From Swiss-Prot:
Cofactor names: Mg(2+)
Pfam families recorded: GTP1_OBG, MMR_HSR1
Binding site residues for GTP: 166-173, 191-195, 212-215, 279-282, 308-310
Molecular-function annotations in GO: GTP binding; GTPase activity; magnesium ion binding
PROSITE patterns on file: G_OBG, GTP1_OBG, OBG
GO biological process: ribosome biogenesis
Organism: Bartonella bacilliformis (strain ATCC 35685 / KC583 / Herrer 020/F12,63)
UniProt protein name: GTPase Obg
């Protein structure tokens, strides 16, 4: 399935039905009086979070959604039928914005959560509603109110426990494919991954979700390579696994490029717990790998791990480190809720 993390939709709720002008007509009742019913309310437009979706691709092909109008009122004080609702099914992590794509309307983070995007118009009053002591047989009724019409942006921010970040060809997709059942495209050229992939990793009976964020480059926070949208997927991650290819001539510079993008993007991305690891260590002699590891450790001020997703050397150690940070973050969240 193709991945789409942003889509514009146009929604319109149903208009209310018109009230009825009607009079009671029965045998032997000469002046039955008014009995016109009210119009039915127009249908609403809802956003609903469903399980099993991880893309907004459906909204590339259908962008206009219109709920049904309410039914007109009828005689015998019968209210018109309510218009049918329209439901936009979206994945967990969908945010909905106004047409300016900046004003947040709602953030949908749980399966089953729903939000009314456009409320149906109320039905008009029938003539029975207008009976007064001085007007026993009114001949007027109200039309229904019009529905709401809005243009909205849907934006998906994947919800993963850990985000795998790094420059293009840092080995992110190979790592994800090695530790999960995800099948991202893997090739020896930059930007193989053009959209995020999710996979479930397991280690020591612990399970967590990892997201392979497409290769970030210098200027990503400004939208270079649509990197600003990719950075948005990192916002919800509990830990960042920052991969640097051991084949980089200057591993320190490669690390700093991504760090600058995180800091410039904002939204506390640079404050997230980060695990730094050198990938593809099976491609260089061990002495050269250790020299690059020491240089990077001096620069980042924390231990730097090394692994190969092909030979699986050091892979479990990296996974255990990621799992430990995620476990601690989950425990902190539970404690906060209890407080």
């Amino acid at each position: 399935m193709k991945f789409l993390d942003q889509a514009k939709v146009y929604v319109r709720s149903g208009s209310g039905g018109a009230g009825a002008v009607s009079f009671r007509r029965e045998k032997f009742i000469e002046f039955g009086g008014p009995d016109g019913g009210n119009g039915g309310r127009g249908g609403d437009v809802w956003a609903l979070v469903v399980d099993g979706l991880n893309t907004l691709i459906d909204y590339r092909y259908q962008q206009h959604f219109r709920a049904k109008n309410g039914g007109h009122g009828k005689g015998r004080n019968m209210t018109g039928a309510k218009g049918d609702d329209v439901v936009l099914r979206v994945p967990v992590g969908t945010q909905i914005f106004e047409e300016d794509n900046k004003t947040l309307i709602c953030d949908l983070t749980e399966v089953g959560q729903r939000y009314c995007l456009a409320k149906g118009g109320n039905g008009g009053f029938g003539n029975l509603h207008f009976v007064t002591s001085t007007n026993r047989a009114p001949r007027r009724a109200n039309p229904g109110l019009s529905g709401e019409e809005r243009a909205l942006w849907l934006r998906l921010k994947l919800i993963a426990d850990g985000g795998i970040i790094g420059l293009p060809n840092a080995g992110k997709s190979t790592f994800l494919a090695s530790v999960t059942t995800a099948k991202p495209k893997i090739a020896a050229y930059p930007f193989t991954t053009l959209y995020p992939h999710l996979g479930v990793a397991r280690i020591d009976a612990r399970e967590f979700v990892l997201a392979d964020i497409p290769g970030l480059i210098e200027g990503a926070h400004e939208g270079v390579g649509i990197g600003d949208r990719f950075l948005g997927h990192v916002e919800r991650c509990r830990v960042l696994l920052h991969l640097i290819s051991i084949q980089e001539e200057d591993v320190v510079k490669a690390y700093q490029i991504i760090r600058r993008e995180l800091e410039t993007y904002g939204n506390n991305l640079s404050d997230k717990t980060e695990i730094v690891a050198l990938s593809q260590v099976d491609t260089l002699p061990i002495e050269e790998c250790k020299a690059k590891q020491e240089a990077l450790q001096k620069s980042v001020g924390q231990p730097v791990m090394m692994f190969s997703a092909v030979s699986h050397e050091g892979l479990d150690n990296v996974l255990r480190s990621v799992a430990h940070v995620i476990e601690m973050a989950r425990a902190d969240m539970i404690n906060k809720h209890q407080d």
